[in-house]
Amino acid sequence: MNTTTSTFDTEALRRGIEERDAATLRALYAPDAEMTVVDRNAPPSQPRVLRGRTAIGEFLDETCGRDMTHLLERVVVSGDTAAFTQACRYPDGTRVLCLAMLDLRDGLIVSQTAVQEWDA
């Protein structure tokens, strides 16, 4: 992982995800950011859309508060775009894989689309 190709802080992303630190993650988003989540509860025809750092922060608080492990498997940054894969595991063994695409402005996330797939 190379953290010198962009002003986007990939190490903060890793720390926030792997340490379940919602405050660190929240700081990576622009005040007017938008997050779109597609998963088993929010299909492509009706995705969950969160607007603004406050709404995104509430989502991150809830996610980081869950008893589970998070691993940032890979992150790629190219100019004003980034992508990452995240693997999660609940204590009962249930796994979740998240793939995310990010649009960046001034080193902050302005738009994120995340697709999450859960074990059946």
Annotate each language-model stretch with its function.
Residues 19, 23, 55, 110:
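Short, flexible micro-motifs
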Residues 2, 58-120:
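A beta-strand edge to alpha-helix "cap/lid" segment located at domain peripheries
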Residues 4-15, 48-53, 109-112:
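Short charge-dense sequence patches
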Residues 1-27, 31:
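Short, low-complexity N-terminal intrinsically disordered segments enriched in polar/charged residues
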Residues 24, 28-77:
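A solvent-exposed, acidic/Ser-Thr-rich amphipathic alpha-helical stretch
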Residues 1-7, 40-47, 100-103:
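Charged, low-complexity, helix/coiled-coil-prone segments
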